[in-house]
A protein has these predicted regions:
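Short alpha-helix plus adjacent loop in nuclease-associated cores
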Residues: 124-148
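Acidic, Mg2+-coordinating catalytic module of metal-dependent nucleases/exonucleases
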Residues: 147-193
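Acidic beta-strand-to-loop metal/phosphate-binding motif
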Residues: 96-103
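N-terminal accessory regions of nucleic-acid-interacting proteins
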Residues: 1-49, 81, 126
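A short alpha->loop->secondary-structure connector
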Residues: 113-123
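A short alpha/beta connector and helix-capping loop motif
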Residues: 58-73
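Short acidic, Gly/Ser-rich segments with clustered Asp/Glu that frequently serve as metal-coordination loops
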Residues: 48-60
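Nucleic-acid-processing active sites and adjacent nucleic-acid-binding tracks
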Residues: 72-92, 96
Length: 193
């Protein structure tokens, strides 16, 4: 499947530039762009990436890994790749800070699927940084409070049947849009907190 480029409307007039691929050999190029072109040039308080994972239908492994910096996104479909991307593993372990929501399962899935762990202190769980009235504030609650009310229906507007299709290549447009918005929320929440 060739790499695809898409523009996704996140909320309001905010547009996201998305690269979607399952080609391991193309991932290093996009990782270099994320790091050298945008992350390295950012101010210190903006030197982090949004990270999110979508799981296989059996919930045992990683199907999709989403990386985000500002409005630049990489959606790598690990489940339909050749599962050999040492540059991605090096990138995840390189000391870059990643912001995500509810890291417990993601850490287990990365260990199971990739055989790696992101270094301690480099993976920020937004649920421990920001709380509303709940003991564990959901991503949707945080997104509505800090980004835009449109995120309140994001999960319910995404058909449950599509959650089982993260391994299907190529991904449907609705899955690409959901994955991009999901990673966008992780990035935007940490930026605002």
């Amino acid at each position: 499947m060739p790499t695809r480029f898409a523009e996704v409307l996140a909320h309001g007039k905010t547009k996201l530039d998305v690269v979607y691929t399952n080609e391991s050999r193309e991932v290093p190029h996009f990782l270099r762009q994320l790091k050298e072109r945008w992350l390295d040039a950012a101010e210190d308080h903006e030197k982090f990436l949004g990270l999110d994972l979508e799981y296989t239908a059996d919930q045992r492994g990683v199907a999709i890994i989403q990386l985000c910096f500002k409005h630049h996104f990489l959606i790598f479909q690990w489940a339909s790749s050749d599962k050999h991307c040492p540059e991605l593993m090096d990138f995840l372990r390189s000391g870059i800070t990643f912001a995500t929501v509810d890291i417990t399962n993601d850490k287990l899935k990365m260990r199971y699927s990739f055989g790696i762990e992101i270094p301690t202190g480099c993976l920020i769980d937004l649920q421990t940084v920001f709380r509303l009235r709940h003991v564990r504030t959901s991503m949707a609650h945080m997104a509505v409070a800090l980004i835009d009310e449109e995120y309140g229906n994001m999960k319910t507007n995404f058909p449950k049947s599509q959650h089982k299709l993260w391994e299907k290549a190529p991904l449907d447009r609705i899955n690409i849009e959901y994955a991009a918005k999901d990673a966008c929320v992780s990035y935007e929440l940490y930026r605002k907190i």
